């Protein structure tokens, strides 16, 4: 009896420690981050970065369409926006919701260092995101950040890169395109949406590079799927992609046929954001990996896609 009681107390202590560690999400990771191509060769590299739980204030909430809002946030304590990599994401606590218990994973859309702002592009997909797009200026949000591994930089021999985004998959492409342009790459975007009204942040993308557009109804750009856009007839040396799974698989197949390096940002359903709940597992050549921790960005050669 005494031994059983001791074991129970020990189990309770271990459970409490594990739960506390998970809630704080303080996990030391080696993140792959962009370093300059025409400066320091390599990939995004920030060593020993810790995930943080930090309050951010909503500085503006711009409704871009019926389904999307752009939140621009600043650290509540006046500090600088934490270093992040294009392709990473944050977990946002949803305020004022009695039924949304889990944080919501949102891609980092852009980091404006001049204004010290972190941008999040939010698509209404359920009760949690409905609360987020309705937030007023001045509201405080609790974020866990930065999460996941972002995009890598192309080899020094690469000059022309294509960034393809469909639907909410355009979100990480703005930040990635901006970072690549700073490092001397020729950046172009291929953006797809159901209609003209669903095309997001076009003016921001046009500041960075050439923009090719496809809409399902032909209301803007080329009529049809992004995977049929004439931009794919041009010569590209690196492809980045994020969007619906059929689109990403089609773009991956295009890249393989043309011997182009390709990275995709997966949108598997997530919960914890730190690899604990195992609900975002993807089958890869290395076995089952948690997208939130080992991704969301993967080179297509690592994925067991039938393409």
Map each language-model feature to its residues.
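Short hydrophobic alpha-helical segments enriched in small aliphatic residues
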Residues: 5-8, 12, 16, 41
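Cationic, low-complexity basic patches in intrinsically disordered or flexible, solvent-exposed regions
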Residues: 9, 24, 33
